[in-house]
């Protein structure tokens, strides 16, 4: 992703730290999800969510005096990084009333603008395994599915669901000065190596801090926090993108100044992470009628949809969607020498050749990225607006001086004048995103859990091996590749699977070569 503000225009006139105080109690909103087995049986898991430390009220450990006010630090409490960490603590969160975050069963909603004592914009949350530990997912060889409602997200907003290689305990075991840990949402990192984090590795980020020129609540410090990032879903009602970002070091590490690269540095490509990624945005790839608001689009964003992402052991990534009980594969793309709908090495090579850039391959491409997906990654869900590029990289023409004839420049139908945070916040304060029905398991396991109905309420299907009928003496038909669709109501493509795979029914509308 291009611009992921760690303080997505966050809580006004507050501060943050990495030890905990108790003036406000901390109770994580509960959120259930399902873990599925290869046989298709899914069991409910009891989890919760926690808001990132950067949103929290931070004050002196012995009083309610702010350590950070507006977009500047207290010179008394925070003269340097180490002293600030000793003097300041972060406090609990009133999730619904302050941050617009609510849960119900397996559903999480994040509101855009919430007005309480102060104004809050957006939020970033992590799924918890326990009260003090983030839930980790090993993506390689597995699939991840969820339902999402983006109907209320206009141009300029991003309801994101993604994974990062941050520490499961929030950094407590590595950095003794961080005593708040995952319980208070510490330890964030991503492929932009964000420098707007108030605390990194148990110390403040006050040294070298420069207040933002266009955001009264944020700034950039001397350090950043880097790690690999898998953007499963960056989207609003206009555009959506799927993007892996490798780093030469997989897990969380601190960086310094412009050596961080990414959004927050003058040298975007000067760090250890790939800030651009290998993105799959159907609109950018020329399919302008696949995703958008209204019945004229294949996927109608005025309605909830299911998103299923599969991580092959080869490192390739597959995607399909379900809406109103009908399954839709990722649309095919024709890009240079590449033709298909799988995000793989050939696709990423073709994208760089056609659209320009080499950051993804320079940082090791999918081979390096497999090192992240083969280990534990933390699930992040957020809603944010973009003070750096107005989200134009997701839903408009970007860079704005390019035209429709420039390969890859047009990413969505939004105007190049859209997405200005001040306008979006005033015009769409009630915007929200809802994520629900999270499932995780081996490839082919989450599409139709035992005893449940496929999306849209169709009768449950069974996971069985189906051999297509053959006619004696006829020539064999076309063969479907591994992970490709091989059957289902309304499907007319190849039904014979490649050698070593069989056609398995996931639901009445979708069978897949597995």
From Swiss-Prot:
The keyword Zinc-finger does not apply. Residues 1-17 form the signal peptide. Residues 18-453 are annotated as: Catalytic. One of its GO terms (biological process) is cellulose catabolic process. It comes from the Eukaryota. Residues 454-478 are annotated as: Linker. Glycans are attached at residues 62, 287, 401, 462-465, 470-472, 474-475, 479, 481, 492. Pfam families: CBM_1, Glyco_hydro_7. Its EC number is 3.2.1.91. Residues 401-437 have a biased composition (Polar residues). Residues 478-514 form the CBM1 domain. The record marks 81 as: Not glycosylated. N-glycosylated. A high mannose glycan is attached to Asn-287 (predominantly Man(8)GlcNAc(2)) and single GlcNAc occupancy is observed at Asn-62 and Asn-401 with some site heterogeneity depending on strains and fermentation conditions. The active site is at residues 229, 234. It is found in: Secreted. InterPro entries: CBD_sf, Cellulose-bd_dom_fun, ConA-like_dom_sf, Glyco_hydro_7, Glyco_hydro_7_sf. It catalyses: Hydrolysis of (1->4)-beta-D-glucosidic linkages in cellulose and cellotetraose, releasing cellobiose from the non-reducing ends of the chains. The enzyme consists of two functional domains, a catalytic core joined to a carbohydrate-binding domain (CBM) by a serine-, threonine-, and proline-rich, highly glycosylated linker sequence. Exocellobiohydrolases (CBH) that catalyzes the hydrolysis of 1,4-beta-D-glucosidic bonds in cellulose to release the disaccharide cellobiose. The degradation of cellulose involves an interplay between different cellulolytic enzymes. Hydrolysis starts with endoglucanases (EGs), which cut internal beta-1,4-glucosidic bonds in cellulose to reduce the polymerization degree of the substrate and create new chain ends for exocellobiohydrolases (CBHs). The CBHs release the disaccharide cellobiose from the non-reducing end of the cellulose polymer chain. This is Exoglucanase 1. The gene is cbh1.
